[in-house]
Amino acid sequence: MIGRITGTLAAKQPPQVLVDVNGVCYEIDVPMSTFYNLPGIGEKVALLTHLAIREDAHLLYGFGSEVERAAFRELLKVSGIGAKTALSVLSGLSVNDLSAAIAAQEIGRIVKVPGIGKKTAERLLLELKGKPVFAGALASVPSAGASDDVRQALLALGYNERETAATVRELPAGLAVGEAIRQALRALSRA
């Protein structure tokens, strides 16, 4: 199995990316949450992966965090949910939002995801209730490289290394990069 790919981002076009690993380009489908947090083309990227082997293809799916990959794998276990639908769910809802919807049995949040109807949403809520990924067991795992991205953004905005490092350490784990930057800026403006 291919568990992680590290290389240079060669191209990106939603929902796919091409990662060049020593001259071999891997085509990887990613949820939009991962896509929006990717570096620029030509920069180094690392993605956790899930390899799906079908009769007619070997497909790679990439994720920015272990939590996201674990959620994808749990979604695949739900009857009637394939890889494309699982990616659609993770593109439409963050793992934390999906976890909250499952815990509260909020069918309305799930049916807003393109490709998910009422029956599929009901099945999803029923089959995923109580799963550790969605019960919060993995919710504290930070995104791969998220804290470094936040630190780099704050340094680019003119904050010094000491205050940046202290602020990043205080951020809650598991935040998306954009939200982490917003919270860090709020914390720095209060200091």
Swiss-Prot record:
As for subcellular location, the record says: Cytoplasm
Q: Enumerate the residue ranges of region (Domain II).
A: 65-138
Provide the residue span(s) of the region labelled Flexible linker. Answer: 138-141
Q: Listed GO molecular functions?
A: ATP binding; four-way junction DNA binding; four-way junction helicase activity
Which InterPro entries does this entry report, sorted A to Z? DNA_helicase_Holl-junc_RuvA_I, Hlx-hairpin-Hlx_DNA-bd_motif, NA-bd_OB-fold, RuvA, RuvA_2-like, RuvA_C, RuvA_C_sf
**One cellular component term from this protein's GO annotations in UniProt:** cytoplasm
Q: Which UniProt keywords apply?
A: Cytoplasm, DNA damage, DNA recombination, DNA repair, DNA-binding
Annotated segments matching region Domain III: 142-191
* Coiled-coil ranges from the UniProt annotation: none
Gene3D superfamilies named in the record: 5' to 3' exonuclease, C-terminal subdomain, DNA helicase RuvA subunit, C-terminal domain, Nucleic acid-binding proteins
- Keyword rRNA processing in the entry? The reply is no
Q: Which SUPFAM superfamilies match?
A: DNA helicase RuvA subunit, C-terminal domain, Nucleic acid-binding proteins, RuvA domain 2-like
Please cite one Gene Ontology biological process associated with this protein: DNA repair
**Alphabetical list of Pfam families matching this protein:** HHH_5, RuvA_C, RuvA_N
Annotated stretches, region: Domain I: 1-64
Name the predominant localization.
Answer: cytoplasm
This protein's domain notes: Has three domains with a flexible linker between the domains II and III and assumes an 'L' shape. Domain III is highly mobile and contacts RuvB.
Purpose of the protein? The RuvA-RuvB-RuvC complex processes Holliday junction (HJ) DNA during genetic recombination and DNA repair, while the RuvA-RuvB complex plays an important role in the rescue of blocked DNA replication forks via replication fork reversal (RFR). RuvA specifically binds to HJ cruciform DNA, conferring on it an open structure. The RuvB hexamer acts as an ATP-dependent pump, pulling dsDNA into and through the RuvAB complex. HJ branch migration allows RuvC to scan DNA until it finds its consensus sequence, where it cleaves and resolves the cruciform DNA.
This protein's assembly is summarised as: Homotetramer. Forms an RuvA(8)-RuvB(12)-Holliday junction (HJ) complex. HJ DNA is sandwiched between 2 RuvA tetramers; dsDNA enters through RuvA and exits via RuvB. An RuvB hexamer assembles on each DNA strand where it exits the tetramer. Each RuvB hexamer is contacted by two RuvA subunits (via domain III) on 2 adjacent RuvB subunits; this complex drives branch migration. In the full resolvosome a probable DNA-RuvA(4)-RuvB(12)-RuvC(2) complex forms which resolves the HJ.
State the similarity comment.
Answer: Belongs to the RuvA family.
What is the name of the protein in this document? Holliday junction branch migration complex subunit RuvA
Q: Which organism is it from?
A: Thiobacillus denitrificans (strain ATCC 25259 / T1)
